[in-house]
Structures are given as C-alpha cells and as structure tokens.
Amino acid sequence: MDILDVAPQEYKVGNNLQANPVGLVGSHIEGRFLNIVARTSVRKNLEHCFQQAKIDIADQLIAPLVTANAVLTESERRSGCALVDFGADTTTISVYKNNILRFLTVLPLGGNSITRDITSLQMEEEEAERLKKAYGDAFYEEEEDQEEATCKLDDDSRTIKVSDLNNIVEARAEEIIANVWNQVQLSGYEDKLLAGIIMTGGAANLKNLDEMLRKRSKIEKIRMAKLPRNTVHAPSNVLKKDGSQNTLFGLLF
C-alpha cells in the first residue's frame, strides 16, 4: 500500500491538545494523523498509462478531497458533515469535523451495481441504465386504485412491470445505503454531524435515494450537491447539473 496523503488530526504538546503546534514550547510532542492509502499497483498502473501516452504528471490529487473542495462549505466542514459521492462503480464516504478530514473510505458499489442487477430482467446494460434513469425509484409505491404501471424496452419487443424493476433497484440501493451508514458509524462521528449529510455524484440522482438514507441514518439534514459552490460558465450542452461532474470542477478551482 502507498500513502497518498496525510491529514493531521491533532497534536499533543506536553499535556495540551493543539490543532497547530507551530510556535509552542513543550518537552515532548505527539501527533495523530489520518493516512490515505491505496494499492501500489493501482498508482503504478495509472502512472504507466500516462507514461505510455507521453503525458507528464504535474501532480496527483485525491478525488474525494477535490470533490469536497468543490461542494462543501467551510461551515459544513467545521460543524461536521459526511460527504457521500455516489459514483458509477464506487461510493466514497468522507467525514469532516472542525475543518479536518476525519475519515475516508471507498465502497466497491455504485450506480452500475444497480444497472447490472436490472439486466437480470433479460436486457443489455445500456437498456437497463435507461430504464433505471427513467423509472428507477428507491422507495417505489404503486397506487392501489391505479392500473399497474409498465415500461417498454426501446425496441418495443416487450414490457416490464415498473414494480418488478424497482424491486431490483430498491434491493441494491438498500445494500449500498446500509454500507454507507455502517461506514459513517465506524468513523465514530455519526452523532457529531451537525451539518448533516451531503450527497453528490451521478448515481445520487436515483429517485428517493436521499429518503432511503434519511430513513436509515435518522438524520434529517440531507442535501444534494448538484453543482459546485463556485460559478462555472459553460454551454448548457456541456455543463451537467446532476453532480456527476463535481470532481472535474474541483480540479479546475
């Protein structure tokens, strides 16, 4: 494993805890740090790709930290919050308190996990992704007095019950949310998130996913960060307002 970055947590100068020990006098000093690590093979493979393309690497930045800089306010970091980035293949959980990164982990579950599950209804992934975006609902409830809703495949070859589709969506979404909240609990800060939970990422747009997280966590203060805090000027056909480009925007700021 390689250490990619180090986030200082606190220092102890003598018997006193300090956020910044510079300029203080003491007989001894201790420090607590959060090490952000990744498999060595992943980093080397990434560097090799750029070398093969003859592109120089100016710097290596960690995506969750870049995203946090783009979407979190200073007040949220100070008060305590959890940033949950629902991506296609992974879900990242970052916990902040007192302007310090306290916890960071990546789960190997994301929006594509739901899409692949939907393919069990005998369709290709492209079609499954379309249906997920159009009809997917983490808390689907069908009205008793209404006719059962259905959706058609693109080629009109057959129809699928929306309830069958969302049984699959809800099951996988529940697994992802359960794992997210478990990681927040492991951080030890689940009762210190005064600013609540901030959701971002393309997969966070699944209907009622925020309600599922609210029900699991019992935290009412949950917001969706679909755009970065800074102003971005771009053509409407380029700028996506769904949170999927927030890491990219963070690299620009």
Residue ranges and their predicted role:
Residues I36-I62, N98-Y140, G243:
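Glycine-rich phosphate-binding loop plus the immediately following alpha-helix
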Residues A225-F253:
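Glycine-rich phosphate-binding/hydrolytic loop that grips phosphoryl groups
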Residues A38, D137-Y140, K192-R216:
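Glycine-rich phosphate-binding loops at beta-strand->alpha-helix junctions
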Residues R102-F103, R116, K161-D164, A195, ...:
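Short beta-alpha connecting loops at secondary-structure transitions
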Residues M1-C81, G136-N166, S187-E190:
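Nucleotide/phosphate-binding catalytic cleft detector across ATP-hydrolyzing
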Residues I177, W181-G196:
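Phosphate/pyrophosphate-binding loops at sites that engage ATP/ADP/AMP, CoA/4′-phosphopantetheine
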Residues F50, D85, I118, V180, ...:
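Residue-level signature of catalytic and energy-coupling elements of molecular machines
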